[in-house]
Amino acid sequence: VVYWANEEKATKIKLRIIQSYFALTTKEMLEQRFELIERYRKEIGPYLTIMDSVGTSIEEVDEYAKLNKPDIMFCDQLDKFRIKGEYNRGDERLKETYVTAREIAKRNSCLVWAVSQASYDAHDRQFIDYAMLDNSKTGKAGEADIIIGIGKTGSSEVDNIVRHICISKNKINGWHGMI
């Protein structure tokens, strides 16, 4: 698994992944750090690469996939990856970025998971569908096999940890709706 982190620091993402894998709080991880280091080296390290990818181009992702043959690549945020070419509008550039990501997946027989922001229309919404993808008309949605929106109820002002998962597009088996 490769995680291209161009939104948050790669070290922060790595810590979250490790913490989720071990199902421990930050405090518990600190208390058990010496035991966890060996487990990390055996259970996670050989299978996870996290790249700090600010300024990375989609062409670099393509080259990496050709050389390293990963099974899964997360591109967080795919919208921020650079791409060659001249585009009249931002949505045209985004569509080409998503087309290229899809082609990378097909050529390299790997899953490419694109992470994208939702537009302001999704703010404080429970049901977030593909029409709410940021800065895209239909380009992003057209290239995706599955689109998962993560929403919430209630105001952003309150401490609300409940999230709602919405499958708004699913070419894999056709099912869509709330989980």
Model-flagged regions — what are they?
Residues 9-13, 58, 80-84, 120-123, ...:
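Flexible loop/turn segments at secondary-structure boundaries
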Residues 48-107:
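Phosphate-binding/switch loop-helix module in NTP-utilizing enzymes
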Residues 2, 14, 18, 62-66, ...:
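Generic hydrophobic alpha-helical scaffold/packing signal
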Residues 16-19, 65, 87-90, 126-130, ...:
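Short, glycine/charged-enriched secondary-structure capping and boundary segments
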Residues 96-179:
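Phosphate-binding/switch region of NTP-binding enzymes
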Residues 9-13, 33-36, 57-61, 74, ...:
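Helical mechanochemical/support elements of P-loop NTPase systems and associated helical scaffolds
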Residues 4-6, 51-53, 75-76, 115-116, ...:
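Generic beta-strand/beta-sheet core signal
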Residues 1-69, 83, 179:
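Cytosolic-facing regulatory segments adjacent to core modules
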